[in-house]
């Protein structure tokens, strides 16, 4: 194990000099330095650049407070490695794979894997396009998720991103026996803590590994924590042959962290001050999220859009990798429609006859057409009232409102708050229900019977209770 000495500390960037003749650490190797020689105060550095004359530039994964020039630095000879396997489920980790949930620390001999890996090769990739059934009607019908696909989850504060994430984790665990990995990138510590306890109460945590690089941590940790979560997910895909769900919140903060260290590493800034390596860094992360012949990693990524500017390089670079988008709309929460997924703004590459089948595709496009026409008629209704519409338009509005309410449903993870049992609706049942509404089979049932229910049978049962 070769050793060097700290030559310079500039915020999260630390220069380390190695004696001439010593073997220099490789790029992405982990180095260890102890503050004041105290073994309990370890700081991990990751090699980013080799500057020549035995000098390497590194990024700190922890605070550099207390580091001084001249401190000894040890080369571990390998990249940052994190625990993998079934023992990670139900646990919370930081970027280095250290357990931070106050439970038993991981054994020293636990299996670990490096966070830096190559993306699967072409011959390992799965060529089939298979839908991942979520049991959530609005997603399965209008913006279905592909196994091994990437989903962008857009939404402001308080519109239900967290509950939607929890329900997806619950449904994958209950219906598919699947594993989920939640990665908080630049998360507020309070939000991460709330999510952990909510998931513990709902029983979802047993099928979930959680990794956090909080907002108060150095940019090095926030930049690498997504790779830590992805490494845990990849193990379940490649070794256990599982279909894994990987949540990243927020992918923008991954880019932001890279931008923070880029200038300190001596790189010229690119457009809007972002790092010139933005597309490469994003590609290295996103290309590892895919389906192989053994299993799949499906990622759901929350994406913050700065100043609602979709041309900003950070979200624009992420968009290039997405297969589906799920847009949450505040107006729908005000109408009491949950999940508040906008059926017209959300989209999916999987919504084609070749992947979902002809019937599903036709029903989905007709639902979108009816909702779009209803949106166009709303101005007329608001100004002149329903009486000014033709009989055909009145029928369309009635069906559109029933569709809008039928896109809502109770969630299993929200049962403790709502007092209503959650529902998991298979895709076939979802398609059949909406087809019957479009065909006018339920025009006589009151609109309220369609609100917050599961399948179409639940609507009929609810209507009978209402004595329509």
From Swiss-Prot:
Keywords, in A-Z order: ATP synthesis, ATP-binding, Cell membrane, CF(1), Hydrogen ion transport, Ion transport, Membrane, Nucleotide-binding, Translocase, Transport
Cell location: Cell membrane
GO molecular function, one term: proton-transporting ATP synthase activity, rotational mechanism
Top-tier EC class: translocase
Domain of life: Bacteria
Predominant cellular place of this UniProt entry's protein: membrane
EC id: 7.1.2.2
GO annotation, cellular component aspect: plasma membrane; proton-transporting ATP synthase complex
Catalyses which reaction(s): ATP + H2O + 4 H(+)(in) = ADP + phosphate + 5 H(+)(out)
Record-listed ATP binding positions: 155-162
Membrane disposition: Peripheral membrane protein
UniProt-listed SUPFAM superfamilies: C-terminal domain of alpha and beta subunits of F1 ATP synthase (SSF47917), N-terminal domain of alpha and beta subunits of F1 ATP synthase (SSF50615), P-loop containing nucleoside triphosphate hydrolases (SSF52540)
SUBUNIT field: F-type ATPases have 2 components, CF(1) - the catalytic core - and CF(0) - the membrane proton channel. CF(1) has five subunits: alpha(3), beta(3), gamma(1), delta(1), epsilon(1). CF(0) has three main subunits: a(1), b(2) and c(9-12). The alpha and beta chains form an alternating ring which encloses part of the gamma chain. CF(1) is attached to CF(0) by a central stalk formed by the gamma and epsilon chains, while a peripheral stalk is formed by the delta and b chains.
Stated role: Produces ATP from ADP in the presence of a proton gradient across the membrane. The catalytic sites are hosted primarily by the beta subunits.
Family matches, as NCBIfam families: atpD
Family: Belongs to the ATPase alpha/beta chains family.
HAMAP family: ATP_synth_beta_bact
Protein name: ATP synthase subunit beta
This protein's encoding gene: atpD
């Amino acid at each position: 194990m070769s050793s060097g000495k700290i030559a310079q500390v500039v915020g999260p960037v630390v220069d380390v000099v190695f004696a001439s003749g010593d073997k220099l650490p490789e790029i992405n190797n982990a180095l260890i330095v102890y503050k004041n020689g105290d073994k309990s105060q370890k700081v991990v550095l990751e090699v980013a650049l080799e500057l020549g004359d035995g000098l390497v530039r590194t990024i700190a994964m922890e605070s550099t407070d207390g580091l001084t020039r001249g401190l000894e630095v040890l080369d571990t000879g390998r990249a940052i490695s994190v625990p993998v396997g079934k023992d990670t489920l139900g646990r919370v980790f930081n970027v280095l794979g250290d357990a931070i949930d106050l439970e038993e620390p991981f054994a020293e001999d636990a299996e670990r894997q490096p966070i830096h890996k190559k993306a699967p090769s072409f011959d390992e990739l799965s060529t089939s396009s298979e839908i991942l059934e979520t049991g959530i009607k609005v997603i399965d019908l209008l913006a279905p998720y592909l196994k091994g696909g990437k989903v962008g989850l857009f939404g402001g504060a308080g519109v239900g991103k967290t509950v939607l994430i929890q329900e997806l984790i619950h449904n994958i665990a209950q219906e598919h026996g699947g594993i989920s990995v939640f990665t908080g990138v630049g998360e507020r510590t309070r939000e991460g803590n709330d999510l952990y306890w909510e998931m513990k109460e709902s029983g979802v945590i047993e099928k979930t590994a959680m990794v956090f690089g909080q907002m108060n941590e150095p940019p090095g940790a926030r930049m690498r924590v997504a790779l830590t979560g992805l490494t845990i997910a990849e193990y379940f895909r490649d070794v256990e042959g599982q279909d894994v769900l990987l949540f990243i919140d927020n992918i923008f903060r991954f880019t932001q962290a890279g931008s923070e260290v880029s200038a300190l590493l001596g790189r010229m800034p690119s457009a809007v001050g972002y790092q010139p390596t933005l597309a490469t860094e994003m590609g290295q992360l996103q290309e590892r999220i895919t389906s192989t012949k053994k299993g799949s990693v499906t990622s759901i990524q929350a994406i913050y859009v700065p100043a609602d500017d979709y041309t900003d390089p950070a979200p624009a670079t992420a968009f290039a990798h997405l297969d589906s988008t799920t847009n949450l709309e505040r107006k729908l929460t005000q109408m009491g429609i949950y999940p508040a997924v906008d059926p017209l703004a959300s989209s999916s590459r999987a919504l084609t006859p070749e992947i979902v089948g002809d019937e599903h595709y036709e029903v989905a496009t007709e639902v979108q057409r009816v909702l779009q026409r209803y949106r166009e008629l709303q101005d007329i209704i608001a100004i002149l009232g329903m009486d000014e519409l033709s009989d055909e338009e009145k029928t369309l509005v009635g069906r559109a409102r029933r569709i809008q309410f039928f896109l809502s449903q109770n969630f299993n993870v929200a049962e403790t708050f709502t007092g209503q049992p959650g529902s998991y609706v298979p895709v076939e049942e979802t398609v059949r229900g909406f087809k019957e509404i479009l065909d006018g089979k339920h025009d006589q049932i009151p609109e309220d019977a369609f609100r917050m229910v599961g399948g179409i049978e639940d609507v009929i049962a609810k209507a009978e209770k209402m004595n329509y």
